[in-house]
């Protein structure tokens, strides 16, 4: 069965509920954007990727450690801009993938950004297949993915592996635009070494914040 629904304005997100044989759908409108600072007053969910599991670099750097460091820097940068930041984790304890999206939805977040570091399976050459990738799933998240991807390319100075639509658990939430960033390849020795440094972690974090700024600034202009 397929439903076609006509809307009076753009849909920012949606939520579908089926309860006692009753189907209902909530449609979310774009947030009101502050013209002087497009991030001020928003709620952003920051998801430092993993644990459990997670990739490990050549010298043993475990992905959840630098992703948390980057996530905490993103939190601090956003908080300084007047953003209400919701973290899916602030320590090394594992958090279920589906719970991460639930945390963002319960907080009524305006966006969800999941922070990761990439790796390749055995048999693939990382020297010819590495760089920065940004994933989204639902169409309403694509503009956020593209804005953040461009900002990450500027900050991290790595090859462009593109913006890709993929059905990943953490970016399936429909209530807000959700993206997953694979900023660098932890399996590359130089990138693993860079991700150990506060300076490069700061650059990763700044790329995310700059991407959010560009996205919400454009959204505010489009919906003004």
Q: Which residue ranges define each predicted feature?
A:
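Soluble non-cytosolic domains of exported or imported proteins
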Residues: 61-69, 94-98, 138-143, 195-206
